A protein has these predicted regions:
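Mobile beta-alpha loop/short-helix "lid" or hinge segments that flank ligand
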Residues: 68-74, 169, 182-184
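C-terminal regulatory/effector modules of DNA-binding transcriptional regulators
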Residues: 180-250
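Short linear motifs at protein or domain termini
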Residues: 1-111, 218-250
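Conserved amphipathic alpha-helical segments that form helical-bundle/coiled-coil interaction surfaces
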Residues: 94, 98, 115-177, 187-196, ...
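Hydrophobic residues in alpha-helical segments
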Residues: 33, 109, 132-133, 197
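Residues at helix-coil transition
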Residues: 34-35, 156, 198-199
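Short helix-capping and inter-helix turn/linker motifs at the boundaries of alpha-helical repeat units
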Residues: 20, 118-119, 181-184
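Residue-level recognition of short, well-ordered coil/turn positions
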Residues: 37, 72, 136, 201-202
Length: 250
């Protein structure tokens, strides 16, 4: 058997490595930050996080280093780790980029979407509306994020999808405190957007998406107008509950 044949056979049977514990801890902590269960400015105590997630302090420490490198956490020598508090300027800049990217996503999606895609978008809208009616912020934020992600997927542009995916978690983080304020208007705008996609009206879809994302951006800026370029004020954290990080590969 030739060496290249061995290499090809070996790659076909390669065993996937399990995700390191520190990475699973990082993912769990990132979601706690995005959902505001760990609030901006909150002091992150290693022992408390370890107890909450059911792990030792070592993967917590490693996860904090990773989150610091990604801008989710700030490490202050002698004081400890804190959830990053975003400034109004950084939120404004990211949401402006999001508006430009997703308006193009909508334009391209209108030219490619089929009946199944429209049906899925209608279901996501219904899920979001139901979450709004029962005041379920987490489900509302998730449905909103999934609508935007799916429209970008429908665009068929992999580079665009990659860029949008990079800002998606930040968008969810910024959207969570204003989801209730956006409320009914947001889901009405989503419905209009889906109508434009179904009508294969690329220009209308792009315009509605831009208006929709700009409304979200403006609501955030209006609600934080008094902050100027100061960091977002820490919100009162939710009651913490123990979360278990799986130790097996998933």
């Amino acid at each position: 058997m030739q060496p290249n044949e061995i290499s090809q056979q070996a790659s076909a049977h390669r065993i996937d490595r399990p995700i390191p514990l520190r990475e699973r801890v990082r993912q769990s902590m990132q979601e706690l930050i995005i959902s505001r269960q760990l609030a901006p400015g909150q002091h992150l105590v290693e022992s408390e996080l370890a107890e909450m997630l059911g792990v030792s302090r070592q993967p917590i420490r490693e996860a904090l280093q990773l989150l610091n490198s990604e801008g989710w956490v700030e490490l202050h020598p002698g004081y400890g780790a804190f959830v990053h508090s975003p400034t109004v300027t950084e939120v404004d800049e990211l949401l402006a980029v999001r508006s430009a990217l997703e308006s193009e996503s909508a334009r391209l999606a209108a030219e490619r979407v089929d009946a199944d895609g429209i049906a899925h978008l209608r279901k996501l809208c219904a899920d979001g509306q139901a979450a709004l009616e029962r005041d379920d912020i987490d489900s509302m934020v998730n449905a909103n994020a999934e609508i935007h992600r799916y429209i970008t997927e429908l665009s068929g542009n992999r580079v665009l999808l990659d860029f949008v995916s990079q800002v998606d978690r930040r968008v969810r983080w910024y959207y969570t405190p204003i989801a209730r304020s956006r409320g009914q208007h947001s889901w009405q705008e989503h419905a209009r957007l889906v109508d434009a996609l179904e009508a294969v009206d690329a220009d209308a879809a792009s315009r509605i998406m831009r208006e929709h994302t700009e409304h979200t951006r403006q609501i955030y800026l209006d609600e934080h107008a008094e902050d100027g370029d100061q960091t977002e004020q820490p919100a009162k954290p939710r009651t913490r509950r123990r979360r278990t990080v799986r130790t097996s590969a998933s």
